[in-house]
């Protein structure tokens, strides 16, 4: 790694007439590219985890920090075949035409054979009837991008990546306000052109969403997360 460029007076993204114009760091709540458009970002590298950050479902299931370089969190089902999820209870992300969104995460399952199923992405809190996530179905190792609107699931991209036991995979997408660009291990793999947004019969849901991790084991399989980022433009 080369030496960093030094901005001794700081770096600003604010307009001259704005409150944070002289603030020596980028405005964390607004974007300098378009006046009136803000930004909202959630990141977690899982070197810290507050107990109320995520709600865990599944009898006796846990979502807790584990030893690992850079920090990791492990979703451990409470029993064989116990469907288990960890999700942010307060929803804050929403697809809006014209406003950009970003999502990325790095995960690994301890095993993927048989009927182990899992997904990671954005969901409507406790409800699995709305969301957009990367999913591995039972009896498959294909990781697909799946959108669910009003309980109707649609596979937007098949074969984004291939799941393997105890193997990291980084998944992500970028919604540019019109199209969705899909990534696996930081490489572009697909584009979803002009998905529609709405409450029913559309490609994407218009409800509020938040990060989620889910696994349904067949024995003692776990799902480990290295990091997650969810960000979007917000009209403020």
Task: Indicate residue ranges for each PLM-predicted region.
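Localized edge beta-strand/strand-to-loop motifs within extracellular or lumenal beta-rich domains
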Residues: 167-181
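Secretory/extracellular carbohydrate-interaction modules
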Residues: 76-143
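Extracellular carbohydrate recognition
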Residues: 216-227
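Short, aromatic/His-centered strand-loop micro-motif at the edge of beta-sheets
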Residues: 148-170
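Short, solvent-exposed beta-strand-to-loop segments that form ligand-recognition rims
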Residues: 160, 187-208
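Short, tryptophan-glycine- and acidic/Ser/Thr-enriched carbohydrate-recognition patches
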Residues: 38-62
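Extracellular beta-strand elements of beta-rich domains used
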Residues: 46, 105, 171, 225-230
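Short, intrinsically disordered N-terminal pre-domain segments
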Residues: 1-22, 234-236
